Amino acid sequence: MATILIIGASRGIGLAALRAALKAGHTVRALARSAAGIPVTDPNLEKFTGDALDPAAVRTALQGVDAVIQTLGVSPSPEMLFNSTRLFSDATRILVAAMQECGVKRLICLTGFGAGDSRNHGSFLFNSAFHLFLGRVYSDKDVQERIIQESGLDWVIARPVILTS
Protein backbone atom coordinates (compact mmCIF):
# COMPACT_ATOMS: atom_id res chain seq x y z
CA MET A 1 0.00 0.00 0.00
CA ALA A 2 0.99 3.62 -0.53
CA THR A 3 2.01 6.33 1.89
CA ILE A 4 -0.14 9.38 1.20
CA LEU A 5 0.30 12.94 2.45
CA ILE A 6 -2.98 14.80 2.86
CA ILE A 7 -2.69 18.57 3.16
CA GLY A 8 -5.75 20.13 4.77
CA ALA A 9 -6.72 16.93 6.59
CA SER A 10 -8.39 18.39 9.68
CA ARG A 11 -11.91 18.79 8.31
CA GLY A 12 -14.21 18.53 5.34
CA ILE A 13 -13.06 16.64 2.29
CA GLY A 14 -9.50 16.37 3.61
CA LEU A 15 -10.74 14.52 6.68
CA ALA A 16 -12.96 12.34 4.50
CA ALA A 17 -9.96 11.52 2.27
CA LEU A 18 -7.89 10.68 5.34
CA ARG A 19 -10.53 8.25 6.61
CA ALA A 20 -10.97 6.65 3.17
CA ALA A 21 -7.22 6.20 2.70
CA LEU A 22 -6.84 4.56 6.10
CA LYS A 23 -9.83 2.30 5.43
CA ALA A 24 -8.21 1.25 2.13
CA GLY A 25 -5.07 0.22 4.05
CA HIS A 26 -2.78 3.11 3.16
CA THR A 27 -0.40 4.86 5.52
CA VAL A 28 -1.39 8.51 5.88
CA ARG A 29 0.65 11.54 6.83
CA ALA A 30 -1.65 14.46 7.62
CA LEU A 31 -0.50 18.08 7.49
CA ALA A 32 -2.87 20.58 9.07
CA ARG A 33 -2.61 23.79 11.06
CA SER A 34 -4.61 22.06 13.77
CA ALA A 35 -3.37 18.47 13.41
CA ALA A 36 -4.03 17.72 17.09
CA GLY A 37 -7.70 18.35 16.36
CA ILE A 38 -7.93 15.62 13.71
CA PRO A 39 -10.53 13.31 15.30
CA VAL A 40 -8.91 10.08 14.08
CA THR A 41 -6.41 7.80 15.74
CA ASP A 42 -4.88 4.95 13.82
CA PRO A 43 -1.49 3.24 13.88
CA ASN A 44 -1.13 4.08 10.16
CA LEU A 45 -1.72 7.82 10.72
CA GLU A 46 1.02 10.35 11.41
CA LYS A 47 -0.17 13.89 12.15
CA PHE A 48 1.94 16.98 11.44
CA THR A 49 1.05 20.41 12.73
CA GLY A 50 2.14 22.88 10.12
CA ASP A 51 1.09 25.40 7.54
CA ALA A 52 0.86 24.66 3.82
CA LEU A 53 2.64 28.00 3.32
CA ASP A 54 5.70 26.85 5.29
CA PRO A 55 8.18 25.18 2.91
CA ALA A 56 10.04 23.43 5.76
CA ALA A 57 6.82 21.91 7.14
CA VAL A 58 5.81 20.72 3.68
CA ARG A 59 9.22 19.16 2.99
CA THR A 60 9.18 17.39 6.37
CA ALA A 61 5.71 15.98 5.77
CA LEU A 62 6.72 14.79 2.26
CA GLN A 63 9.46 12.45 3.51
CA GLY A 64 8.72 8.85 2.46
CA VAL A 65 5.50 9.77 0.66
CA ASP A 66 4.28 8.16 -2.59
CA ALA A 67 1.48 10.63 -3.37
CA VAL A 68 -0.10 13.87 -2.15
CA ILE A 69 -3.73 14.91 -1.83
CA GLN A 70 -4.11 18.70 -1.47
CA THR A 71 -7.47 19.81 -0.06
CA LEU A 72 -6.98 23.43 0.92
CA GLY A 73 -10.00 25.56 1.67
CA VAL A 74 -11.09 28.90 3.02
CA SER A 75 -14.03 29.55 5.29
CA PRO A 76 -16.78 31.65 3.71
CA SER A 77 -16.67 35.24 4.92
CA PRO A 78 -17.69 38.73 3.81
CA GLU A 79 -13.99 39.43 3.16
CA MET A 80 -14.19 37.10 0.16
CA LEU A 81 -16.21 39.79 -1.62
CA PHE A 82 -13.53 42.43 -1.34
CA ASN A 83 -10.13 40.83 -0.75
CA SER A 84 -8.13 38.64 -3.06
CA THR A 85 -6.34 35.57 -1.79
CA ARG A 86 -3.13 33.87 -2.79
CA LEU A 87 -3.45 30.92 -0.41
CA PHE A 88 -4.09 28.37 -3.15
CA SER A 89 -1.41 29.52 -5.60
CA ASP A 90 1.24 30.22 -2.94
CA ALA A 91 0.69 26.89 -1.17
CA THR A 92 0.74 25.05 -4.49
CA ARG A 93 3.99 26.71 -5.60
CA ILE A 94 5.57 25.60 -2.31
CA LEU A 95 4.14 22.08 -2.62
CA VAL A 96 5.17 21.55 -6.24
CA ALA A 97 8.73 22.75 -5.55
CA ALA A 98 8.99 20.50 -2.49
CA MET A 99 7.56 17.51 -4.38
CA GLN A 100 10.10 18.01 -7.16
CA GLU A 101 12.91 18.35 -4.61
CA CYS A 102 11.80 15.21 -2.71
CA GLY A 103 11.09 13.14 -5.83
CA VAL A 104 7.35 12.73 -5.17
CA LYS A 105 5.54 12.52 -8.51
CA ARG A 106 1.79 12.03 -7.84
CA LEU A 107 -0.56 14.87 -6.88
CA ILE A 108 -4.32 14.94 -6.51
CA CYS A 109 -5.63 18.45 -5.95
CA LEU A 110 -9.17 19.56 -5.17
CA THR A 111 -10.09 22.97 -6.49
CA GLY A 112 -13.75 23.43 -7.39
CA PHE A 113 -16.28 23.73 -10.16
CA GLY A 114 -15.76 27.17 -11.64
CA ALA A 115 -11.97 26.97 -11.67
CA GLY A 116 -9.95 26.70 -14.84
CA ASP A 117 -11.83 25.68 -17.96
CA SER A 118 -15.00 24.91 -15.96
CA ARG A 119 -15.59 28.65 -15.43
CA ASN A 120 -18.81 30.03 -16.94
CA HIS A 121 -20.38 26.62 -17.52
CA GLY A 122 -23.40 27.39 -15.35
CA SER A 123 -26.51 29.40 -16.07
CA PHE A 124 -26.37 33.18 -16.36
CA LEU A 125 -27.74 33.55 -12.83
CA PHE A 126 -25.28 31.02 -11.41
CA ASN A 127 -22.30 32.58 -13.19
CA SER A 128 -23.25 36.10 -12.08
CA ALA A 129 -23.64 35.13 -8.41
CA PHE A 130 -20.55 32.94 -8.55
CA HIS A 131 -18.31 35.73 -9.84
CA LEU A 132 -19.73 38.21 -7.34
CA PHE A 133 -19.21 36.03 -4.26
CA LEU A 134 -16.35 33.71 -5.21
CA GLY A 135 -14.59 35.41 -8.12
CA ARG A 136 -11.50 36.48 -6.18
CA VAL A 137 -11.01 33.05 -4.59
CA TYR A 138 -11.48 31.26 -7.89
CA SER A 139 -9.07 33.57 -9.69
CA ASP A 140 -6.42 32.20 -7.34
CA LYS A 141 -7.63 28.64 -7.95
CA ASP A 142 -7.11 29.29 -11.67
CA VAL A 143 -3.48 30.16 -10.94
CA GLN A 144 -3.21 27.09 -8.69
CA GLU A 145 -4.39 24.83 -11.51
CA ARG A 146 -1.93 26.36 -14.00
CA ILE A 147 0.95 25.76 -11.59
CA ILE A 148 -0.02 22.09 -11.32
CA GLN A 149 -0.58 21.66 -15.06
CA GLU A 150 2.86 23.11 -15.82
CA SER A 151 4.65 21.20 -13.02
CA GLY A 152 5.63 18.03 -14.85
CA LEU A 153 4.06 16.00 -12.04
CA ASP A 154 1.61 13.13 -12.53
CA TRP A 155 -1.48 15.09 -11.47
CA VAL A 156 -5.25 14.93 -11.18
CA ILE A 157 -7.37 18.01 -10.50
CA ALA A 158 -10.84 17.34 -9.11
CA ARG A 159 -13.49 20.08 -9.17
CA PRO A 160 -16.36 19.20 -6.86
CA VAL A 161 -19.48 21.31 -7.27
CA ILE A 162 -20.86 21.51 -3.73
CA LEU A 163 -19.37 20.08 -0.55
CA THR A 164 -21.86 19.84 2.28
CA SER A 165 -19.65 18.98 5.23
Predicted regions and their residues:
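N-terminal Rossmann NAD(P)H-binding glycine-rich loop of SDR-like oxidoreductase domains
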Residues: 4-24
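Conserved beta-strand positions in the Rossmann-like core of class I SAM-dependent methyltransferases
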Residues: 5, 29, 156
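Conserved beta-loop-beta element that borders a ligand/cofactor-binding pocket
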Residues: 145-165
